[in-house]
């Protein structure tokens, strides 16, 4: 075949045939060996095509699949050829016309595959009953055994039939087994490619669909001769069983292997479909938009597909890849339109041809319209331009899980141990009544020190064989039950519940009869207290050093010893801060401060120059020392690792805790360098030093006292007028400012409290205007109800 010569003279003769008088050309016209004789198939039938080649032979899907011209004229065609070398005359080829591609080229390709060329059948020559209405033969039979039965070429498309192998069929072959061919059984996959720019018309769809194939018995066909036998698949005569019918658009033909591919014009393919049995086409016919000018039609069925296998076609010098048998899934089959198959009729539902993906179009449509206007009866991307926005009615808010799970015998009220909510009894709860288990969030890897003090009180540690297994966090009301609101007792008298672990869970059990209107207050069991490292009884005071004190007076005395041991030099410290044990040889040139390293001196000097490169990400504050920034960040994160064992207050710095502990002892260890006055807190000493260092220009008209600010003078004038509007509800003390009353309430526990209240901590080193020098604190006498505005006046009264 490589030595084939297509002479120009022969080409001119071939091109002289007109479209209306097209002559099919065989291999004898081209100087090739004559192909085996074949008989023309009857005109009625289903158009089929040669099976596709594998990707190894051609870059196109098939070297034997044809895209026939859309009409009679000069429209182009596409054809894939095997990767073989052919001797052809040099270009150009003015003699090649469309008739060459419709008649000559199919014959060449068919000869290469040792298969007969396609037979051309015009659909108008077929009646509704399937018989030939008009048989036209324009070519003498002597020229080629394969004759065209119509004078009009293909215009609209093809329907392809692929060869498949069915396990249940016998291995029969149309050709003799001469070593060049393999036995094939036949299955049919129909695919209609219609080159129309508008949906297929649904007119005239009440006709019968027939499929004619060509089969032959292997034992009856000698070498060089072939017989033809039509097979029909319709809705009346054929009953296909599930084991012999394929799946996904594959319909097997009962008989021997398919020999002759038939190509038919499909202008009105829908007019040939009617009354298809559900056993043949049990699902539907689907259309998928392939391009703007073509539609692909696939027939799908729900029969078993397991019996189909791949098959290979062999020929001398030509090898076809195995024909893969694959099903048409529902997602692939359901495209932009479908044909519903019913027992009455087969109707086609047209759809618009689109190039874009249908799924993306649906998503775009879903996101485009968001609001439906019932008055306009349409959707809008936003509010209706005519009727405005719609009215939304929100759901009724529901309470958290913790509050909804509260038993009916209990209620939630303000706790007596703090500002949080506590659990109170609505009726009598008998002794040995168990509540639980405690429900919360489990954490298997958690650092308790990273939690705030409030969160630590809601952390329950669960141990297994003495090893911490996990923790139960009870901070989220939506994740916990009502037991998260039960508070811890401060002493033995308040305790009425015992908390203990069991099987990895926490339970509360009443230790006494609890009458109504009493708060549930728990403390840990003896074993559980030992596991978590707390005292066995709530009234035992535990020091940081590990010493347990049975009474508050004993614990206070023990705490005083710690203060003297840890702060020996703070009694005579200057306003610049405490002295250090290490030698401070790096002195500042702008102030008398000294440092133990040049890096600390450099950071300190940046403060004098106003350089603060370290800024806080949460607020606008900046610092020259990065350590001060780290300390400041604890304010935003709420991390307070230093906790007071007496009042459960927590602090971000150890120095603040030590300063706070002085409040409980009542000792004044900080002495002013300018006078002999003593103070408990360093902040109070710092404010007092301003009296000696800063000049006061605002003078009181009644007592000639000087103040730094006008607001300080106004507060001082209230003392002359006797206005002490801020009175403690627990005792008889009254204060000039709300700040001093708030500070007093934090330490006031008894009506006869003697010491002035002190704030727990001032993170920024400034308590505000109320705490600046000149703001005076009133003190009350224990023996009488007299109130005084200064410590000196109170001492004189005593």
Curated annotation (Swiss-Prot):
PROSITE patterns, per database record: SET, ZINC_FINGER_C2H2_1, ZINC_FINGER_C2H2_2
Class of the enzyme per the UniProt entry, highest EC level: transferase
Any single GO BP term: cellular response to growth factor stimulus
Location in the cell: Nucleus
Keyword terms, alphabetized: DNA-binding, Metal-binding, Methyltransferase, Nucleus, Repeat, S-adenosyl-L-methionine, Transcription, Transcription regulation, Transferase, Zinc, Zinc-finger
Task of the protein: May function as a transcription factor involved in cell differentiation.
Listed name of the protein: PR domain zinc finger protein 4
Species name: Rattus norvegicus
Encoding gene, per UniProt annotation: Prdm4
